[in-house]
């Protein structure tokens, strides 16, 4: 028979507080990293093979956005209005125009530059408005789990089931 006494409730509350502490600590670390790196997304997972062989699918990129100028050859992550997924590509050309830097990018594994990604509105990216950050480091394949969760429903539901089963078993 299951005992739902005061001890069981106390144990459940302690577990919930532990989960809340882990979640809030992780969130605070991420937000602190965002402030230090001056980037809304200081960690980005590579989702496509457009930057191979430099970066593989599943690599986690560490971004820095405190420099005013980006050099040709550096890898940047940028967002375009209307697109939900940031793009990771190398700077091919750089131009100064009206006190702002304009960039032309291209994936290492792509045949052509990214002008078609820019939506036909212009031929270059505005460094100040569209670049999320410059890649300063990476962790190989660490983010592959996010790709598996997004692309494989069996993996996602299997992981949720195992997590629920472990929580149930540990609760007894």
From Swiss-Prot:
<keyword id="KW-0645">Protease</keyword>
<dbReference type="InterPro" id="IPR019533">
    <property type="entry name" value="Peptidase_S26"/>
</dbReference>
<dbReference type="InterPro" id="IPR015927">
    <property type="entry name" value="Peptidase_S24_S26A/B/C"/>
</dbReference>
<dbReference type="Pfam" id="PF00717">
    <property type="entry name" value="Peptidase_S24"/>
</dbReference>
<dbReference type="GO" id="GO:0008233">
    <property type="term" value="F:peptidase activity"/>
</dbReference>
<feature type="region of interest" description="C-terminal short (CTS) helix">
    <location>
        <begin position="158"/>
        <end position="169"/>
    </location>
</feature>
<feature type="topological domain" description="Cytoplasmic">
    <location>
        <begin position="1"/>
        <end position="15"/>
    </location>
</feature>
<protein>
    <recommendedName>
        <fullName>Signal peptidase complex catalytic subunit SEC11</fullName>
        <ecNumber>3.4.21.89</ecNumber>
    </recommendedName>
</protein>
<comment type="function">
    <text>Catalytic component of the signal peptidase complex (SPC) which catalyzes the cleavage of N-terminal signal sequences from nascent proteins as they are translocated into the lumen of the endoplasmic reticulum. Specifically cleaves N-terminal signal peptides that contain a hydrophobic alpha-helix (h-region) shorter than 18-20 amino acids.</text>
</comment>
<feature type="active site" description="Charge relay system">
    <location>
        <position position="114"/>
    </location>
</feature>
<comment type="subunit">
    <text>Component of the signal peptidase complex (SPC) composed of a catalytic subunit SEC11 and three accessory subunits SPC1, SPC2 and SPC3. The complex induces a local thinning of the ER membrane which is used to measure the length of the signal peptide (SP) h-region of protein substrates. This ensures the selectivity of the complex towards h-regions shorter than 18-20 amino acids. SPC associates with the translocon complex.</text>
</comment>
<feature type="active site" description="Charge relay system">
    <location>
        <position position="89"/>
    </location>
</feature>
<keyword id="KW-0378">Hydrolase</keyword>
<dbReference type="GO" id="GO:0005787">
    <property type="term" value="C:signal peptidase complex"/>
</dbReference>
<keyword id="KW-0256">Endoplasmic reticulum</keyword>
<dbReference type="InterPro" id="IPR001733">
    <property type="entry name" value="Peptidase_S26B"/>
</dbReference>
<keyword id="KW-1133">Transmembrane helix</keyword>
<dbReference type="GO" id="GO:0045047">
    <property type="term" value="P:protein targeting to ER"/>
</dbReference>
<dbReference type="InterPro" id="IPR036286">
    <property type="entry name" value="LexA/Signal_pep-like_sf"/>
</dbReference>
<feature type="topological domain" description="Lumenal">
    <location>
        <begin position="37"/>
        <end position="172"/>
    </location>
</feature>
<keyword id="KW-0472">Membrane</keyword>
<dbReference type="GO" id="GO:0006465">
    <property type="term" value="P:signal peptide processing"/>
</dbReference>
<keyword id="KW-0735">Signal-anchor</keyword>
<feature type="transmembrane region" description="Helical; Signal-anchor for type II membrane protein">
    <location>
        <begin position="16"/>
        <end position="36"/>
    </location>
</feature>
<keyword id="KW-0812">Transmembrane</keyword>
<comment type="similarity">
    <text>Belongs to the peptidase S26B family.</text>
</comment>
<feature type="active site" description="Charge relay system">
    <location>
        <position position="50"/>
    </location>
</feature>
<dbReference type="GO" id="GO:0004252">
    <property type="term" value="F:serine-type endopeptidase activity"/>
</dbReference>
